[in-house]
Amino acid sequence: MPPDRNLAPPSLLLLALEGRAWLELAALVPSLPLLAGTPRGDGHPVLVIPGYLAGDRSTRALRAFLRHRDYHAHAWRLGLNLGPSPRIVSRLGERLRELRARHGRTVSLVGWSLGGLYARELARRRPEDVRQVITLASPFRDPSASNVALLLGQRRRAGAGDLAAQLREPLPVPTTSILSRSDGIVSWRSCLEEEGPRRENVVVESSHCGMGHHAAALAVIADRLAQPEGTWRHFTSWGIGPWRAERLATR
């Protein structure tokens, strides 16, 4: 997939609709009967990485769901995600090695927004420790195509092109990018993975800030994590109406 040029952030209307994240959290309870039918896991460790300006509290519902699906779900334990730095990347690497040693198994990485960019970098650096990567609304094709970057005056900084090119590179482990066309924070096109035998994109109808507790996104995560280690197949579809998830073919 060729690099995108001058991706625009989402419209101000979509940004205003981000408030629906609270409704998506409230909708999680009535969706539990649907989620009860998702596959259970094999107990392998999963490291969940929060988004920008968020911490482990924001991923509590996601981790609780994963534990109910029989995974060892772990927080990142690095406080608020204040943006990339060599220190954070180094400490995340230590956290990954710790979990690998503790469980004696490779670790699946689930990253929300900026957390997904961290997950991709970890998998690039230590593929031997990573089982698979799942990103939620993570703009790895162009991190600057976001309303946050625009408001902070960080759009098209020097070196941003080199960073985006590195982030776009396909990973050596199975990769699923979950995205929403109605995302109000980042351009959904900036979340598109280059499709391949072990790479895919899955679309849900969710806000950016609510994706980590959106029923359809949780169902996709459960489906992806439940695949036996060493095997992988593309996602097809799940759910109905607002809880619909389906694979997006980019070829």
Regions found by a protein language model. Name each.
Residues 1-46, 59-64, 69, 102, ...:
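Flexible, membrane-associating and regulatory peripheral segments of lipid-active enzymes
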Residues 2-18, 32, 45, 49, ...:
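A near-ubiquitous, low-amplitude feature marking generic local secondary-structure context
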Residues 4, 124-251:
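Helical cap/lid subdomain of alpha/beta-hydrolase-fold lipid enzymes
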Residues 11, 32, 38, 57, ...:
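Residue-level detector of functional hotspots within protein domains
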Residues 20-29, 50-59, 176-188:
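Phosphate-binding glycine-rich loops and adjacent basic patches that engage nucleotide phosphates
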Residues 25-26, 36-40, 67-73, 92-96, ...:
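Short amphipathic alpha-helical segments, especially helix-boundary/capping motifs
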Residues 28-31, 97, 101, 154, ...:
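Generic surface-pattern signal
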Residues 44-57, 61, 65-173, 178, ...:
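Serine-dependent carboxylesterase/thioesterase catalytic core
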